[in-house]
Amino acid sequence: MNVIWRSCICRLRQGKVPHRCQSGVHPVAPLGSRILTDPAKVFEHNMWDHMQWSKEEEDAARKKVEENSATRVAPEEQVKFESDANKYWDIFYQTHKNKFFKNRNWLLREFPEILPVNQNTKEKVGESSWDQVGSSISRTQGTETHCQESFVSPEPGSRGRSAPDPDLEEYSKGPGKTEPFPGSNATFRILEVGCGAGNSVFPILNTLQNIPGSFLYCCDFASEAVELVKSHESYSEAQCSAFIHDVCDDGLAYPFPDGILDVVLLVFVLSSIHPDRALFI
């Protein structure tokens, strides 16, 4: 699988200091140079560089870790929670629906590398979001971009928008498998693993709808989460395919052939998987 490096950078010409891809919402800042000097402006960006804890903050964090580790889960309970994890997440989504997590409207501003290069797009964050954001955010990624290298690990021949591969349109030649797969006509494809209620899905779709030939796959091992995505008013099978899938089970098939993805996105996913199972991703 492709992985989006959280430390993605774009290098300017002539060996200048690394910069992130240009964003029309936030000013271009060299990677590592976004320093919080005024605490009153802490919410102006989603993240800040080189934040250092005070001695008091470090001691408080250590105390919390010790408190959390004081009570351990019994081994038999660990097995149950691990084997039935999807069921517990189903209960979570049955209880909280789409109200627990906020939409990641910052995602494409902080990581514009997710989108195809050299695309003119407008990011619309509006009523199609779960949290019904009232305002819309416009951003334009110019055709003369500073980013010459994306550092998003690509599939061979990807990252640009190429012509559709006719061999992919009916990749399943076996009996009963003659239908084109979802997104078979797309030229740029993203997969989000662990989509939950769609808090990354719909901010991304708001932008992808302005990029012809793009398609978004999203999966979760909790069936309730997938149903929440499919029930959203902005969900369209013409540009998105949501499906149930456990990425730790390498015996499960995907609804698309190997080698067609341009970007794979995992947001707060790896940290929730047992290290032993993460080896199968």
Swiss-Prot record:
Transit peptide: 1-22
GO cellular component: cytoplasm; mitochondrion; nucleus
Keywords (A to Z) from UniProt: Cytoplasm, Isopeptide bond, Methyltransferase, Mitochondrion, Nucleus, S-adenosyl-L-methionine, Transferase, Transit peptide, tRNA processing, Ubl conjugation
Spans annotated as Disordered: 139-180
A Pfam family: Methyltransf_12
Consequence of gene loss (knockout): Mice were born with normal Mendelian ratio without developmental defects. Cells show reduced N(3)-methylcytidine modification in mRNAs.
Classification via InterPro entries: Methyltransf_12 (IPR013217), METTL2/6/8-like (IPR026113), SAM-dependent_MTases_sf (IPR029063)
Subcellular location: Mitochondrion; Cytoplasm; Nucleus
MF (Gene Ontology): histone acetyltransferase activity; mRNA methyltransferase activity; tRNA (cytidine-3-)-methyltransferase activity
Record's protein name: tRNA N(3)-cytidine methyltransferase METTL8, mitochondrial
Organism: Mus musculus (Mouse)
Lineage, uppermost ranks: Eukaryota, Metazoa, Chordata, Craniata, Vertebrata
